């Protein structure tokens, strides 16, 4: 098993997309990259904690390659936007990757370069020290599945899920 920690806007969207992929064993929403010891959602939303909303994606590389996990990441958010994704604005919504070791850091650098080759514009995605991971509150875990009628999810997460299902169809879980 391999674990990546990725931040790219609201963690509800990242969580929703990665849960659709075969080989993804777990997705945990949380906070990372800040200076507050025990961050809460309300505190992180202020932008004052330094933490990013992120997901911890645990996956089986024999089922889904690491490069695909990373290409999905760059498909489901706009890595050219600094400290925002759509209407979500602040450093808590930054595009960032948190490698566990030098091998992951190189995978992340290669993925940023691939994304840059495909985009009209340069990714602003940062590679940041791993630091301490903080699980988000329980109600944020698998939020999209638990709240299918929620307006934000319908407006923002559904199009991202559909885009990834189309672009990475061979890796989508069978229904």
From Swiss-Prot:
Provide the top EC class. oxidoreductase
Choose any GO biological process term that the UniProt entry carries and state it: protein modification process
Key word S-adenosyl-L-methionine present? no
Q: Which GO terms describe its molecular function?
A: L-methionine:thioredoxin-disulfide S-oxidoreductase activity; peptide-methionine (S)-S-oxide reductase activity
Task: Read off the InterPro entries from this record.
Answer: Met_Sox_Rdtase_MsrA_dom, Met_Sox_Rdtase_MsrA_sf
Q: Which UniProt keywords apply?
A: Oxidoreductase
Under what name is this protein listed? Peptide methionine sulfoxide reductase MsrA
Name the gene for this chain. msrA
């Amino acid at each position: 098993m391999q674990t990546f920690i990725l931040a790219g806007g609201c963690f509800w969207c990242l969580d929703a997309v990665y849960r659709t992929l075969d080989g993804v064993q777990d997705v945990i929403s949380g906070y990372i990259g800040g200076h507050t010891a025990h961050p809460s959602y309300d505190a992180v939303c202020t932008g004052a904690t330094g933490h990013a909303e992120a997901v911890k994606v645990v996956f089986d590389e024999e089922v889904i390659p690491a490069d695909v996990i990373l290409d999905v990441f760059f498909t489901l958010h706009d890595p050219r936007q600094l400290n925002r994704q759509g209407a979500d604005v602040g450093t808590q919504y930054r595009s960032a990757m948190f490698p566990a070791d030098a091998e992951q850091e190189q995978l992340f650098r290669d993925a940023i370069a691939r994304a840059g080759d495909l985009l009209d514009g340069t990714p602003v995605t940062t590679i940041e020290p791993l630091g301490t991971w903080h699980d988000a509150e329980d109600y944020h875990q698998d939020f999209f599945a638990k709240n299918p009628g929620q307006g934000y999810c319908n407006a923002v997460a559904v199009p991202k899920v559909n885009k990834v299902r189309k672009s990475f169809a061979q890796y989508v879980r069978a229904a």
